């Protein structure tokens, strides 16, 4: 069956099997290691439990939040997200229709939980948040490269915390690659988030070739 699936990939592409599991699941980890899978990544779910209103910090000069307007802005947000995540592990250029179906065309979608930071007519950063299993969930937090290292990510994160706090949601979580190249884990720890769950990702290469994840 694996051979049949490989035939679906273009002949020049790298093919691999990738599985994730709890870091504490020693049985599954040993099975994968015995089958010559490589440990390639650690993934954290981080949480914070709010006991008081989070602090508020100003947004960088020239940056303002505007309400998310679905039809007018959804493609712009898609583009901003795709750009912001180009240097993240596992990134593959996205497809707008699939993105829209997964994120916006959902019955539970609440546009007031999407916080978009603008610099003039350019999206500088965003926080896409939602409710997930009784937790306020930061589904995606991103800052485009020209606006990094100015405190925008922290301002967006704390703004999201405050919006959840106002709605009575005191537990807030997110998922992050433990080796995130933009320093996201340091930011999350700075605002009081702690590791709640750690997963590991194993990979076994079936065929070498061109890797879509390494291309922009």
Predicted feature locations:
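A short beta-loop-alpha structural element at the N-terminal edge
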Residues: 64-79, 90
């Amino acid at each position: 069956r694996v051979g049949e699936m490989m035939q679906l990939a273009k002949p020049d592409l790298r093919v691999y099997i990738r599985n994730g599991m709890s870091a504490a699941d020693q049985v599954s980890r040993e099975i994968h290691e015995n089958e010559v899978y490589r440990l390639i990544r650690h993934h954290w779910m981080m949480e914070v439990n709010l006991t008081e209103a989070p602090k508020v910090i100003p947004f960088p000069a020239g940056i303002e939040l505007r309400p998310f307007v679905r039809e007018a802005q959804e493609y712009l947000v898609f583009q901003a997200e795709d750009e912001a995540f180009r240097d993240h592990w596992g990134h593959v250029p996205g497809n707008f229709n699939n993105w829209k179906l997964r994120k916006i065309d959902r019955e539970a979608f609440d546009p007031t939980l999407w916080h978009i930071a603008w610099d003039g007519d350019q999206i500088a950063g965003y926080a896409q948040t939602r409710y997930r299993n009784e937790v306020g969930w930061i589904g995606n937090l991103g800052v485009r490269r020209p606006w990094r290292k100015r405190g925008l990510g922290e301002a967006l994160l704390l703004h999201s915390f405050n919006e959840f706090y106002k709605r009575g949601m005191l537990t807030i979580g997110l998922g992050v690659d433990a080796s995130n190249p933009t320093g996201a884990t340091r930011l999350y720890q700075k605002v009081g988030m702690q590791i709640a769950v750690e997963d590991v990702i194993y990979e076994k290469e079936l065929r070498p070739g061109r890797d879509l994840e390494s291309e922009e």
